[in-house]
Each structure stands twice: as C-alpha cells, then as structure tokens.
C-alpha cells in the first residue's frame, strides 16, 4: 500500500498558533522530539467557543500543560489568570519563556508550577 503524502498546512513544523484574542496568530514552538502533543486548533476553537460567555475574568488551570497552549489561549481571550502544571522540567522552562514573551515583564497572569498534576491536585 502506498503511503499518502502529508497535508501541507502552511505552518512551521513544531509550532501551534493562538486562535483568537489579543495574541491571535502568534505561535508557540514545540520542541522537536518532545513527548508533547498540543491540542489541535479545531478542538481548541470549539472548546473556547463554548467557554466564550464565561471566560473573561476567570481563573484557569492547565493541567499537564506541555506547551501551555490551552492556558495561553484562555489568557489571550480575556481570562484573568492561568496556572500551568507541568512535570517535565524542559517543558516548564519553555513555557515560562513563552509566557515572558507573550505577557511581558511585570505581568504575572500566567504561573508555571513544576509538579505532577495528580499529586498537586491531591494537595
């Protein structure tokens, strides 16, 4: 059986984009070889369309954050704050750098916690 060619989407390999809000169109790089599978655009778009009426001013929790794209999308769309819980040290550092670029110095709407999400929730 012949393998079909992959579909070209026009996006750089290893990145996801913010769909809407103040950071619309900005990209988050995904480390090559990382064990991270970001939530696809279409799924995020549907999720945030459902949440749109209640999202502004809310506090969000992005568990198993990886790239942090869910929490960053929430911030972009008006959430007051997002906490990101990620166990992998490299992914947590990358997420802190992305938040620094997006939210800027002196803004602390995003907080990265390096922890196992289940243990962190258990308290």
Identify the role of each PLM range.
Residues 1-123:
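Class I S-adenosyl-L-methionine-dependent methyltransferase catalytic core
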């Amino acid at each position: 059986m012949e393998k079909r060619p992959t579909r070209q989407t026009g996006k750089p390999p290893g990145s996801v984009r913010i769909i809407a809000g103040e950071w619309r169109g900005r990209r988050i790089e995904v480390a090559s070889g990382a064990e991270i599978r970001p939530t696809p655009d279409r799924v995020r778009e549907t999720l945030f369309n459902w949440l749109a009426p209640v999202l502004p001013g809310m506090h969000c929790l992005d568990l198993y954050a990886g790239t942090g794209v869910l929490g960053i999308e929430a911030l972009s769309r008006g959430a007051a704050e997002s906490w990101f819980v990620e166990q992998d040290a490299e992914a947590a550092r990358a997420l802190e750098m992305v938040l620094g670029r997006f939210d800027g110095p002196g803004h602390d709407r995003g907080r990265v916690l390096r922890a196992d999400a289940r243990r962190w929730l258990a308290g």
